[in-house]
Each structure stands twice: as C-alpha cells, then as structure tokens.
C-alpha cells in the first residue's frame, strides 16, 4: 500500500507545541512516527568519555512526532492539504485534494 506522506515531503504540524511550523521529513518509522527537520528538538546531556575521545556537553536532537499530528503542506495554497491517488497510464501518482496538482 502506498503511503500518503513520504520522505522529503514538506509538512506542517497541526497540533501541539509546534503547531503551524513547517519542515521536511528526514526519516519515517514503521510505528507511525517521523523525524521532521527543526521540529520537536530536545536537549541531551552527555558526559565526556576519555577512552573514546569524545567531548561532553549539551546536544540538541530531533525527536519523532506522530504522523497523525502532521499534514502535507501545499505550497501553492499555503495551507495544509490532504492527499489522494490517481492512476494514469499504469502509474500511480499522489496529488493534492484541493487543487489536483501532482506532489513532487
């Protein structure tokens, strides 16, 4: 089955702390979550390890967010949109529901 949201899609967060922010999908997990560029960032504290020659400090890490909380972002309308599928000449395409344009 084809997925409606794929890697490198421009998305917008619909609910929660980051509502209204946009970003690109970096990684999608099988449990229905995704890592989105610049969204849901947490700070991790790490001690230095002299054996591995790694310095310690505070590092920022992007955490997964549920795909049910995001929607694909339509650049033409500047709004979140829904996705539907269309088959032309034996090929399946994803298109925006509002204006019928193909998703790149």
Curated annotation (Swiss-Prot):
It holds the Pfam family KOW. Residues 41-61 are annotated as: Disordered. Keywords: Ribonucleoprotein, Ribosomal protein, RNA-binding, rRNA-binding. One of its GO terms (biological process) is translation. GO terms for cellular component: ribonucleoprotein complex; ribosome. InterPro entries: KOW (IPR005824), Rib_uL2_dom2 (IPR014722), Ribosomal_uL24 (IPR003256), Ribosomal_uL24_KOW (IPR041988), Translation_prot_SH3-like_sf (IPR008991). GO terms for molecular function: rRNA binding; structural constituent of ribosome. It comes from the Bacteria. One of two assembly initiator proteins, it binds directly to the 5'-end of the 23S rRNA, where it nucleates assembly of the 50S subunit. One of the proteins that surrounds the polypeptide exit tunnel on the outside of the subunit. Part of the 50S ribosomal subunit. PANTHER family: MITOCHONDRIAL RIBOSOMAL PROTEIN L24. NCBIfam families: rplX_bact. Belongs to the universal ribosomal protein uL24 family. HAMAP family: Ribosomal_uL24_B. This is Large ribosomal subunit protein uL24. The lineage of its organism: Bacteria, Pseudomonadati, Pseudomonadota, Gammaproteobacteria, Enterobacterales.
């Amino acid at each position: 089955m084809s997925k409606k949201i794929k890697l490198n899609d421009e998305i917008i967060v619909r609910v929660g702390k980051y509502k209204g922010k946009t970003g690109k999908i970096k990684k999608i997990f099988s449990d229905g979550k995704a890592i989105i560029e610049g969204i849901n960032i947490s700070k991790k504290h790490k001690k230095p390890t002299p054996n591995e020659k790694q310095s310690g400090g505070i590092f920022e890490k992007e955490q997964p967010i549920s795909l049910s909380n995001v929607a694909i972002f339509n650049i033409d309308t500047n709004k979140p949109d829904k996705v539907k599928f269309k088959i032309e000449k034996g090929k399946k395409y994803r298109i925006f529901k509002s204006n019928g344009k193909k998703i790149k």
